[in-house]
Amino acid sequence: MEMDILSVLEHKFPSFSKGQRTIAQFILKNYDKAAFMTAARLGEVTGVSESTVVRFAADLGYRGYPGMKKALQEIVRNRLTSVERIEAAESTMDGHDVLKAVLRADINNLQATLDEIDQDYFNQAVDMILSAKHIYIIGMRTSTTLADFLAIYLKLLLDDVTVVKEIAAREVYEQLLRIGEGDLIIGISFPRYSKRTISAMKFARDRGARCLGLTDGKVSPLNEISDVCLYTKSEMVSFLDSLVAPLSMINAFIMAVSARDRTRTFETFRELENVWKEYEVYGTVES
């Protein structure tokens, strides 16, 4: 198993220079705060130059300081409670900068997802959706919103789509009782990963269904369970996980599925428009 950054620091500590040891010691004791610091700020609190901090990150094998910072934030996301996350973020973020900080984080998540997405995996995911006899979608906690959004549109485009709802633990498995070969389960989960989603994916896999995961990276437990797993960035600000990039990926799923059979898509929405008009589903703007 790949070591996390804290394990790497402990392992390499004896070989560090004096300045590197100072940085490493601070991070090991205060990783929750270091995860939100700029290179300049980390250099300031450790008494070394910003360039020393940047070189330190590169020596550890990261693509500059942003790469090391992301690795630290992964630790924070997986180890800290929501309250601890708030405290860590507030200790390094000026309240007046919240709006820009959140918007920048979302922009960065989208850009990182765009830079790292594997187009072949995405195409495989779309093929899995289109070839499935029955599609089950599961996402717990904040991922419920993503699962529901995906289901709304897939139900318009495809025939057999079910959202697995979190009511009680046993009822999750009851909703998956008929799943089997030829079916697909789409699992959506981000740190702190839902045990129920992971368990439901394993349940479906054991019954012969194919598994498609949407998560944040290779360290996610969904990665080992899924036949195809797509990664989107969801770097957090305080107790929040950003759902912007995951939602954008879901939008891409929906658009790709609809594009594979444009005739059916047009017919479906033409019929829906007539229904919406007849039953006054939407209001009209009077000029």
Q: Residue spans of the language-model regions?
A:
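Short, Lys/Arg-enriched, disordered terminal segments
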Residues: 1-12, 284-287
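HTH-adjacent hinge/linker in prokaryotic transcriptional regulators
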Residues: 2-6, 15, 22, 32-36, ...
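Glycine-rich phosphate/diphosphate-binding loops that line cofactor/substrate pockets in enzymes
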Residues: 120-132
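Glycine-rich phosphate-binding loops that contact phosphosugars or nucleotide phosphates
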Residues: 130-248, 252-261
